[in-house]
A protein has these predicted regions:
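An N-terminal structural lobe/cap that precedes and organizes the functional/catalytic core
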Residues: 1-12
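Conserved phosphate/anionic-ligand binding catalytic regions in large, soluble enzymes, centered on
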Residues: 10-28, 278-297, 341-349
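Alpha-helical support elements that line or immediately flank enzyme active sites
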Residues: 19-36, 295-307, 353-361
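Short, mixed-charge aromatic SLiMs
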Residues: 44-57, 88-97, 317-330, 372-385, ...
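C-terminal regulatory domains involved in ligand/effector binding and gene-expression control
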Residues: 72-253
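Accessory "access/gating" subregions that flank catalytic or transport cores
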Residues: 202-336, 340, 448-455
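Hydrophobic alpha-helical bundle architecture
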Residues: 308, 320, 326-399, 411-420
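Extended hydrophobic packing segments that form well-structured cores
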Residues: 420-455
Length: 455
């Protein structure tokens, strides 16, 4: 397998979920690639969503996502007008245009199966099969959407287990301890180490982070200025970001309230999280469900903490955040279906805390402390989306995740702070806690608020 890029912790895609929307879309597009040379023989496609993909798939738009993917389209390429046209053809006219070349009949009620039983390898699995005119299987593949928009086949997972994701990558690290040692050895900060690593892989870290930053800004602008009153779905959740923005423009917060800046953090986080919930274009950070934490903390820093924050400083924030996210992906999980919301909002808060500490000229040790503090106070957080939608409690958790990140960063900068828990230890604890967590609380909508709140 190709060496893993830390930059891929951030992906431009569409809402509402990285594992349940972006992942299935990629699986569908990749399956189209397997049909090259036999496409004209395909008469029918069967899609089976397993586990969490089945249980929350309709609310997370997993069903629509895989259909779009089967047209050969990836999430970063999708336009809203294209999405509407393709889904109308597939769902209303029952025509699926495989790889955007070969039209077949598609019956949603028969060809798309929701199987609540998870497969052994991961809670988010889907099986795609292509049949010929004799109803014989031409091609079959199982895909696992493991969180953050990352998708693997059975063989790819086996290779990961046997070989690891990276072989002899310069400046690579597998733990926070190794990262700290690298920084000390080369007298570099975390962002600089990530630059060196990605340069060795022939990537363009600064150009990529600038692109990611502008996509985050666009997402915020779209959410803050939306004319839609309600988010899609049965809950009819009101979009609050536009009204918060209007209020703050008319009545800016004064110095009388020392916590008034929280209103701006709420605006930034809600705008982005609401845009994600509406199916808009977003950036995984590290997931869609937690996509607002990192950018809202960055906007807080840019608009309220520092004057004239340079693009390099913004890139440093994002590269540092990505390095922290990489540690969680490598040693734990980014999937709410595998480890609960601690693996999404918790990781995002940990990433943002580290990024903010970096901007505040913290030492590498202090950056890692900030990231540890933020995760420590998300341990055990369940993933229980009401109605299978990425709205309640997801949107407000983004707000609180950002506030915790800022608090964690400030605490880590205290000269006398001496941590008892390391980042590596809290990452291991998060993963173990997630594995011990009852399946009802891991993105199934079978427990917690999802069960208590009737919709």
């Amino acid at each position: 397998m190709a060496s893993f890029s830390i930059l891929s912790i951030f992906k431009i895609g569409v809402g509402p979920s990285s594992s349940h929307t972006i992942g299935p879309m990629e699986a569908g597009a990749r399956f189209c690639g397997l049909l090259k040379g036999i496409l004209e023989q395909v008469m029918r496609i069967q899609i089976t969503l397993h586990g969490s993909l089945a249980l929350t798939g309709k609310g997370h738009l997993s069903d629509e996502a895989v259909l779009i993917g089967l047209h050969g389209i990836y999430a970063n390429e999708l336009e809203l007008t294209t999405k509407k046209a393709l889904l109308h053809e597939a769902l209303e006219n029952k025509v699926l245009k495989l790889a955007n070349q070969h039209c077949i009949h598609f019956d949603y009620s028969k060809d798309l199966i929701f199987d609540n039983k998870p497969l052994a390898r991961h809670q988010n699995a889907l099986i795609l099969k292509a049949f010929n005119a004799k109803n014989e299987v031409l091609k079959e593949e199982t895909y696992y959407s493991v969180g953050g928009g990352f998708v693997y086949t059975e063989k790819e997972l086996d290779n990961l287990s046997e070989e690891g994701e990276n072989e002899s990558v310069a400046y690579d690290f597998s733990s926070a301890k190794e990262l700290l040692e690298l920084c000390q050895k080369h007298q570099k900060n975390i962002a600089e180490i990530v630059r060196l690593r990605e340069d060795a892989l022939k990537n363009r870290p600064d150009a990529m982070m600038a692109k990611i930053y502008h996509a985050m800004l666009e997402c915020y602008d779209n959410g803050a200025n939306s004319k839609e009153k309600y988010l899609p779905g049965s809950l009819r959740v009101t979009r609050l970001a536009p009204s918060i923005k209007t209020r703050l423009e008319k009545h800016p917060t004064s110095g009388k309230d020392p916590l008034a800046l929280i209103d701006y953090i709420s605006l930034y986080a809600r705008a982005i999280a609401e845009e994600n919930a509406s199916g808009g274009k977003v950036v995984t950070a590290p997931t869609n469900g937690a996509c607002a934490v990192v950018p809202s903390v960055l906007l807080y820093a840019k608009n309220h903490l520092f004057e004239n924050l340079s693009q390099k400083a913004i890139n440093d924030f994002l590269l540092t955040s990505a390095a922290i996210g990489y540690l969680y992906k490598k040693n734990a999980s980014l999937s709410g279906a595998e480890a609960g919301c601690q693996a999404e909002i918790g990781v995002a808060s940990s990433m943002a805390a580290g990024g903010l500490a970096c901007l505040c000229q913290a030492s590498t040790q202090q950056v890692l402390i900030a990231s540890e503090i933020a995760m420590e106070h998300h341990l055990g957080l369940t993933c229980d989306p009401v109605g299978g939608l990425v709205q309640i409690p997801c949107i407000e958790r983004n707000v609180l995740g950002a506030i915790k990140a800022i608090s964690a960063s400030k605490l880590a900068l205290e000269d006398e702070y001496k941590p008892k828990v390391s980042l590596d230890e809290v990452i291991a604890t998060m993963y173990a806690t997630g594995k011990d967590m009852n399946e009802k609380y891991k993105e199934t909508s079978l427990g917690g608020l999802a069960k208590t709140l009737k919709c």
